[in-house]
């Protein structure tokens, strides 16, 4: 298969691929046996990222398109080493290798989610500021569902007993800023809505199962 055929296949079936892998993730991580399988999490996130990259339309400004990877990683590295702007927290080894206590995959996850929200809202409005605000709100809402599950699975831990309010404020503000700064690098991707549906569904279901 050539590149065009591979992209066509994933555009047609990529949503099923990521849905099946996340369903398997729920089965493996939703029970008492989850400690035996949680270290497979990076493979699932990597698959999600690769599928999203393959299904993206032609990228005319690749550096701007990929910039959220670096932005997300650097701000997380700042956060884990200084406590600013999210609060005092630290990552475990579950999300794979990293630098200065920050997994490399966390920057990739910022990119996938930010680009997905940006793409979805770009289909509704042409106002870049409104799109960026909606992206920030979407990222904030998703993080609310992610936090209890990620903490329970040992992805990261907070020094405080509860997730600090500044985490959510920073998540929204940074998502808005990153979306606005990189808006001109956005491209359409048929997988965007499925990334959000699957990721949202995964963390909602996992949150229910782990209560």
Segments predicted by a language model, with ranges:
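Aromatic-rich, lipid-facing transmembrane alpha helices and their immediate juxtamembrane interface loops
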Residues: 1-211
């Amino acid at each position: 298969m050539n590149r065009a055929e591979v992209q066509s296949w994933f555009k047609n079936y990529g949503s099923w691929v990521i849905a099946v892998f996340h369903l398997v993730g729920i089965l493996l991580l939703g029970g008492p046996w989850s400690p035996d399988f949680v270290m497979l999490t990076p493979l699932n996130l990597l698959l999600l990222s690769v599928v999203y990259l393959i299904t993206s339309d032609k990228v005319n400004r690749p550096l701007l398109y990929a910039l959220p990877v670096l932005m997300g990683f650097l701000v997380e590295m700042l956060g884990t080493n200084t406590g600013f702007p999210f609060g005092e927290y630290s990552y475990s080894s579950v999300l794979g290798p990293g630098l200065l206590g920050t997994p490399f995959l966390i920057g990739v996850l910022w990119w996938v989610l930010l680009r997905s929200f940006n793409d979805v809202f770009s289909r509704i409005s042409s106002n870049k500021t409104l799109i960026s605000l909606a992206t920030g709100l979407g990222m904030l809402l998703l993080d609310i569902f992610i936090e209890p599950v990620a903490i329970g699975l040992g992805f990261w831990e907070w020094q405080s007993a509860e997730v600090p309010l500044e985490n959510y404020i920073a998540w929204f503000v940074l998502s808005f800023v990153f979306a606005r700064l990189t808006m001109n690098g956005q491209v359409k991707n048929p997988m965007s809505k499925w990334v959000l549906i699957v990721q949202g569904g995964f963390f909602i279901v996992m949150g229910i199962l782990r209560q």
